[in-house]
Amino acid sequence: MSKSERRVFLLDFEKPLYELEEKINQIRELAEEKNVDVSEQLSQLESRAEQLRQEIFSNLNPSQRLQLARHPRRPSTLDYIQAIADDWFEMHGDRGGYDDPALVGGVARLGTRPVVIMGHQKGRDTKDNVARNFGMAAPNGYRKALRLMEHADRFGMPIITFIDTPGAWAGIDAEKLGQGEAIAVNLREMFRLDVPILCTVIGEGGSGGALGIGVGDRVLMLENAVYTVATPEACAAILWKDAKKSDKAAIALKITADDLAKLQIIDGIIPEPKGAAHANPLGAAAKLKEALLFHLNTLAQLTPQERKQLRYDKFRHLGQFLETAV
């Protein structure tokens, strides 16, 4: 991310760190221009910047993590695929006459393994987001995903899904094309597949849109991703008739990776680089690849029947909750 982009997309809680880093850069440039030794002062300021970065990113509240999950420069499905996989070949169409740019998928090689990778795809700018429907997949997107899953199962290739959507497309045309049925069929069929399935929430994990490619042997989350039954804004509008109470809803919904790990909804948290994934996309991709390879190696030791039974049991046992006052 360029310096100008960082300034444009700066989040409120990042401003103190940004201002300090700008001060460091200005002092460094001035010292070089005037040929003055300020190494000791720079060292002190850099130590302070590192301390401030640690303070900010180790004490994020749910709403702040939601902002990071929605950051316009957060790595997308295609960004991660290009960074971690080789021989990527995208496949299109649901074999019913439709394609969906909001959900991409294809075959690739992860390490030494051929795999099928799919995930929601948001845009980088307004035009791209409109073309990709802001990552909200239509029924044909979920049917395309199912076709790719069946392809993977037929050829014995593990399935990797990347979840990053505010929710499934809720337009009238989506209902006409059978949105609910498409997601429901995917849920049913993912329990039946013989091959290993790894699901990772890389940004927003929104409602049924996330679940449509979210049934796996392992469900992982990036450190600053969120996973929720409804957006905090929608929840606040429903419960309190006021979308401005979304901060309160974000706390009650338990949307963060830490909360969901405690509730055993997810199986693991993938740490992000300092400053979150958008600050260091390649560093985030390296940590993601490491986690995927580890879990693929673990799942490869099980028989298909063992994996399916564990997969079924995992989702049947979901349901822990914490009582809180809202």
From Swiss-Prot:
PROSITE patterns: COA_CT_CTER. Residues 44-298 form the CoA carboxyltransferase C-terminal domain. Its main location: cytoplasm. One of its GO terms (cellular component) is acetyl-CoA carboxylase complex. GO terms for molecular function: acetyl-CoA carboxylase activity; ATP binding; carboxyl- or carbamoyltransferase activity. InterPro entries: Acetyl_CoA_COase_a_su, ClpP/crotonase-like_dom_sf, COA_CT_C. It is found in: Cytoplasm. It comes from the Bacteria. Keywords: ATP-binding, Cytoplasm, Fatty acid biosynthesis, Fatty acid metabolism, Lipid biosynthesis, Lipid metabolism, Nucleotide-binding, Transferase. It catalyses: N(6)-carboxybiotinyl-L-lysyl-[protein] + acetyl-CoA = N(6)-biotinyl-L-lysyl-[protein] + malonyl-CoA. The keyword tRNA-binding does not apply. Its EC number is 2.1.3.15. One of its GO terms (biological process) is fatty acid biosynthetic process. Pathway: Lipid metabolism; malonyl-CoA biosynthesis; malonyl-CoA from acetyl-CoA: step 1/1. PANTHER family: ACETYL-COENZYME A CARBOXYLASE CARBOXYL TRANSFERASE SUBUNIT ALPHA, ACETYL-COENZYME A CARBOXYLASE CARBOXYL TRANSFERASE SUBUNIT ALPHA, CHLOROPLASTIC. Belongs to the AccA family. Component of the acetyl coenzyme A carboxylase (ACC) complex. First, biotin carboxylase catalyzes the carboxylation of biotin on its carrier protein (BCCP) and then the CO(2) group is transferred by the carboxyltransferase to acetyl-CoA to form malonyl-CoA. HAMAP family: AcetylCoA_CT_alpha. Acetyl-CoA carboxylase is a heterohexamer composed of biotin carboxyl carrier protein (AccB), biotin carboxylase (AccC) and two subunits each of ACCase subunit alpha (AccA) and ACCase subunit beta (AccD). This is Acetyl-coenzyme A carboxylase carboxyl transferase subunit alpha.
